[in-house]
Amino acid sequence: MVVDKIQAIRGMNDVLPDSTSVWRFIEQTFINCLVRYGYKEIRFPIVENTQLFKRTIGEITDIVEKEMYTFNDLNGDSITLRPEGTAGCVRACIEHGLLHNQQQKLWYLGPMFRHERPQKGRYRQFNQFGVEALGITGTAIELELISICRRLWTDLGFSQSVQLQVNSLGEINERQKYRSILVEYLHDHFHILDEDSKRRLDKNPLRVLDSKNPDLQHLIQNAPKLIDVLGDDSREHFQSFCNGLETLGIPYSINPVLVRGLDYYGQTVFEWVTDQLGSQATICAGGRYDMLVEFLGGAPTPAVGFALGLERIFLLMETLNLLNESNNKQSIFIIATNEEAILKALVMAESIRNAHPSLDVITNTAGGGFKSQFKKADKSGARMALILGEDEIAREYVSIKDLRTEIEQISIPMTKINEFLQNYLA
């Protein structure tokens, strides 16, 4: 009987064992960094009430109009697979009273879903790492988030391959004033606009500045600048932020058409971009969203955050040949040639794991000849092989072969293996 194979849904990819160690390294680097800064993890559902995203992201956005996975459940309620994390994080904070006269510094990690056209670096299920700081005013917290990003890039090895772009969206009344100016400009060039931009023109004209259509880039770059209509308070806030970046020694450039793709942003916004990934240039984006908590029924609460896609980070590290450097944890492969040797290998492996918790120990329990097992050992990336053959078992010795250097193979008593490893791997 021929049975059709079931394959993964387009744009939703499997992460196979050859890649998961690198993913784990990237994830653990993020987690370790945020813990050092005093941020705490929060977890919230993958599925939310559809109104959560319509109210926060904005109904006249590509995400809400075209990209959300929305469906009715068995009760007839409209629910949506989360397309981003900030809205769900804020909803959880309000629901559980985390913002009552409190400041929260939070991080989260997990899958998001958008029905976009799949391409390299952009998928329909993607993994996002997010950071949110709620209840804190001023530019110091914004500068802390930028500092976190810079440390992440340094820890991952590509700090010289990304650049920081910043802008200010000002207060809502300033955006409304700018909106009228921008609409007039765009109407004067209406014949140039694509259908998406024409549709956005009346309801959300700032979205036009977020267009990635190459035919519109000249028009966008020459559009009136929002920063030119900012009031004194917004200018002072943005200047304080820029001064702080200079004090911290963080290079940046002002991008006057940087508006972000979500409706809830105001004041400071930023993106980290790279020239290594073609059209997928943005690897991290964020900004201030002081009105979002109030949008969702909470008390007015200042807030700022950022998010980045792990697939995009993986792709950048792959492009820069950094993946091998990220997977350099020391490990040992134990070669055993028969059933008695395999049992000895299992006992030895547990002893090594007890004595050296940071060391990975791979035991070959499938048997096989020396040649095939050495191939497995080499492919595993292990630094050394411990060999338990018939001669070694008879003498209660273990042979040791360094797989990464030309050091000559040696044999030592089994009882001395932990002492040897302590000295050899120091």
From Swiss-Prot:
Statement: the UniProt record of this protein carries the keyword Nucleotide-binding: yes
Pfam families in alphabetical order: HGTP_anticodon, tRNA-synt_His
Reactions performed catalytically: tRNA(His) + L-histidine + ATP = L-histidyl-tRNA(His) + AMP + diphosphate + H(+)
Cellular location(s): Cytoplasm
Principal subcellular localisation of the protein: cytoplasm
E.C. no: 6.1.1.21
InterPro entries tied to this protein: aa-tRNA-synth_II, aa-tRNA-synth_II/BPL/LPL, Anticodon-bd, Anticodon-bd_dom_sf, His-tRNA-ligase, HisRS-like_core, HisRS/HisZ, HisRS_anticodon
Cytoplasm recorded as keyword: yes
Key words, A-Z: Aminoacyl-tRNA synthetase, ATP-binding, Cytoplasm, Ligase, Nucleotide-binding, Protein biosynthesis
GO molecular function: ATP binding; histidine-tRNA ligase activity
GO cellular component: cytoplasm
Biological process (GO), any one: histidyl-tRNA aminoacylation
HAMAP family in the record: His_tRNA_synth (MF_00127)
Similarity field: Belongs to the class-II aminoacyl-tRNA synthetase family.
Oligomeric form and interacting partners: Homodimer.
Protein's UniProt name: Histidine--tRNA ligase
Lineage: Bacteria, Pseudomonadati, Pseudomonadota, Gammaproteobacteria, Legionellales
UniProt gene name: hisS
